[in-house]
Curated annotation (Swiss-Prot):
It comes from Corynebacterium glutamicum (strain ATCC 13032 / DSM 20300 / JCM 1318 / BCRC 11384 / CCUG 27702 / LMG 3730 / NBRC 12168 / NCIMB 10025 / NRRL B-2784 / 534). Keywords: 4Fe-4S, Amino-acid biosynthesis, Branched-chain amino acid biosynthesis, Iron, Iron-sulfur, Leucine biosynthesis, Lyase, Metal-binding. InterPro entries: 3-IsopropMal_deHydase_lsu (IPR004430), Acnase/IPM_dHydase_lsu_aba_1/3 (IPR015931), Acoase/IPM_deHydtase_lsu_aba (IPR001030), Aconitase_4Fe-4S_BS (IPR018136), Aconitase_4Fe-4S_dom (IPR036008), IPM_dehydratase_rel_enz (IPR050067), IPMI_cat (IPR033941). PROSITE patterns: ACONITASE_1, ACONITASE_2. Belongs to the aconitase/IPM isomerase family. LeuC type 1 subfamily. Its EC number is 4.2.1.33. It is an enzyme of class 4 (lyase). Induction: Repressed by RipA. It holds the Pfam family Aconitase. This is 3-isopropylmalate dehydratase large subunit. GO terms for biological process: L-leucine biosynthetic process. Pathway: Amino-acid biosynthesis; L-leucine biosynthesis; L-leucine from 3-methyl-2-oxobutanoate: step 2/4. [4Fe-4S] cluster binds at residues 363, 423, 426.
């Protein structure tokens, strides 16, 4: 699906992001005008696509390239009681209408759809990679901010608004000004028990939730190179939490091995040609980034959030901060507000914070590697008295893979709920929600006020910390078990 242009043989020293951008410019903007960028793949779901389809109808336009669109049902679908994928299995009327509308739109406009009940259904940012639709060097968009997940493959992937979704439907292009580039250089190697989730939370705490605004982040260094694709997807997924437009990791053999043989991946001679192009994508030696940030990966320990934005995080071994710990007045005010909402007392050890619900799910951390990590910790244990643990695989495919490995039994034997695929408790948009005042340890990506339900309090954690927390009942790491 990539569309490199003739100037891809340029000798100019370029970053990964600059190469992908260059190879997709249909027309170059002049006098400060945006470039017109070709889009290789648009992903769709039931929440942000209905208005775009309606826009096509009202203007009498056709979907320019149905084959470059891929849809699934994820945001509003229930994660229990789903057996056939029938609309009757959705109790909420609005959710049922949204899913029904997506099905009708995809049928009318010829878009490939993976609905509930289909083994290939799941969260849109898991479905693309598992099908091989997500490939290095592509431009990928979706009406969802966590489209940045796909940047783990060396693609430029970013979320867009509904009007832009319609623009891509009609033209397969977007007018955009080039993004700035930022290198996140991770030195050293991650210690055992420290994951990509801990790393990305530490990065966001370091640069802030606005530190990446206007940038494409490229994650670099030996620690990144040694990560699996599942771990890399976690890194890129949360780039938006640092304010970035996208996050990217250069493709390598790990990437190629993941993509090869998947349903929508190139085959035969096309595969060889694709890999040859993909190998040209990594940032050139001597290329210049607009900004460089360094972080010592070897010094990291399990990392969690204590507040109400992903940048309010600390190592698990620390204590709840005081507003007086912050020198910036805005940070001080934000800390005061967050502590009040989270009902936390400064000086309280983070490990003493009692948790009501553990959520292992979302497009951030519910792939097979995440489930395996959590299951290995839970095996032979029971979750704490009064604890609720929900395990929601990010796709039906992954659910079946986990069941073949016996992971579902480990979770249910421990007392956890084993659910069907969907966005679930990541966002308070479906039946899976916290009650007011309840506190969760969640492997998702956002801890805003009310994100998991009105009045709910969210701590972002890794799958390992989630599992350990479920056992002990307070925020914990596997070392505490």
């Amino acid at each position: 699906m990539t569309s490199p242009v003739e100037n891809s043989t340029s000798t100019e020293k370029l970053t990964l992001a600059e190469k992908v951008w260059r190879d997709h410019v249909v027309s170059k903007g002049e006098n400060g005008e945006p470039d017109l960028l070709y889009i290789d793949l648009q992903l769709l779901h039931e929440v942000t696509s209905p208005q775009a389809f309606d826009g096509l109808r009202m203007t009498g336009r056709k979907l320019r390239h149905p084959e470059l669109h891929l849809a699934t049902e994820d945001h509003n679908v229930p994660t229990e009681g789903i057996k056939t994928g029938s609309l009757l299995e959705i109790n909420d009327k609005i959710s049922r209408l949204q899913v029904s509308t997506l099905r009708d739109n995809c049928e009318e406009f010829g878009v490939r759809l993976h609905p509930m009940g289909d083994v290939r259904q799941g969260i849109v940012h898991t479905v693309g990679p598992q099908l091989g639709a997500t490939q290095p060097g592509m431009t990928i968009v979706c009406g969802d901010s966590h489209t940045s997940t796909h940047g783990a493959f060396g693609s430029m992937a970013f979320g867009i608004g509904t009007s832009e979704v319609e623009h891509v439907m009609a033209t397969q292009t977007l007018p955009l000004k080039p993004f700035k580039t930022m290198a996140i250089e991770v030195t050293g190697e991650l210690q055992p028990g420290v994951s990509s989730k801990d790393l990305i939370l530490a990065i966001i705490a370091k640069i802030g939730t606005g530190g990446g605004q206007g940038y494409v982040l490229e994650y670099r260094g030996e620690a990144i190179r040694k990560m699996s694709m599942d771990a890399r997807m976690t890194m890129c997924n949360m780039s938006i939490e640092a304010g970035a437009r996208a996050g990217m990791i250069a493709p390598d053999q790990t990437t190629f091995d993941y993509v090869e043989g998947r349903e929508m991946a190139p085959k035969g001679a096309d595969w060889d040609e694709a890999v040859a192009y993909w190998k040209t994508l990594p940032t050139d030696e001597g290329a210049t980034f607009d900004k460089v940030v360094e972080i010592d990966g070897s010094a990291l320990t399990p990392f969690i959030t204590w507040g109400t934005n992903p940048g309010q995080g600390l190592p698990l071994g620390e204590s709840v901060p005081s507003p007086e710990d912050f020198t910036n007045d805005n940070d001080k005010a934000a800390a005061e507000k967050a502590l009040q909402y989270m009902d936390l007392v400064p000086g309280t050890p983070l490990r003493d914070i009692k948790i009501d619900t553990v959520f292992l799910g979302s497009c951030t951390n519910a792939r097979i590697e995440d489930l395996q990590i959590a299951a290995d910790i839970l095996k032979g244990h029971k979750i704490a008295d009064g604890m609720r643990m929900m395990v929601v695989p990010s796709s039906t495919w992954i659910k079946q893979e986990a069941e073949a490995l016996g992971l579902d039994k480990i979770f249910t034997d421990a007392g956890a709920e084993w659910r069907t695929a969907g966005c679930s408790m990541c966002l308070g948009m479906n039946p899976d929600q916290l009650k007011p005042g309840e506190r969760s340890a969640s492997t998702s990506n956002r801890n805003f006020e009310g994100r998991q339900g009105p009045g709910g309090r969210t701590h972002l954690v890794s799958p390992a910390v989630a599992a350990a927390t479920a056992i002990r009942g307070t925020l914990s790491s596997p070392a505490d078990i």
